[in-house]
Amino acid sequence: MGSVSLSDIQVTPLARIATDGGDVMHALKKNDPDFVGFGEAYFSWLDHQKVKAWKCHTEMTMNLIVPFGQVRFVFCDLDSEPEVFRIEEIGDYNYSRLTVPPGVWFGFQGLKVNSSLVLNIADIPHDPSEVKKLGEHEINYNWS
């Protein structure tokens, strides 16, 4: 894994097509430019104002989508002094996919009253040995 920058995170607006029976929501196509492979897809529920932070995948490319709710993703460059952050909010009001390369520290927070749902379409199956973790307060970011 080479050096990674917060600018390497891709934001792709996604189609949300209204139909009589309910919306059709696109996620990821094999021929999308940022598709690098399929290993696993999994969902994570996130309660209102709750935070899940901080993680860094050393091998996994994540494709993060919020099909229900609204979520603030905070990405951090720990090599900068002081730390540099990039914030992306996706979901009901900005239906998009975030493609995050390996080596980026991140956390996320639920913004919708009740719950939000995050989908990760990863290029490899989940492997706990390739994940680094820090506690929520170990990176100096104010979630309020």
Model-predicted regions and their roles:
Residues M1-R97, L111-S144:
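Non-catalytic, conserved peripheral segments adjacent to functional cores
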Residues F106:
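Glycine-centered loop/turn positions within well-structured domains
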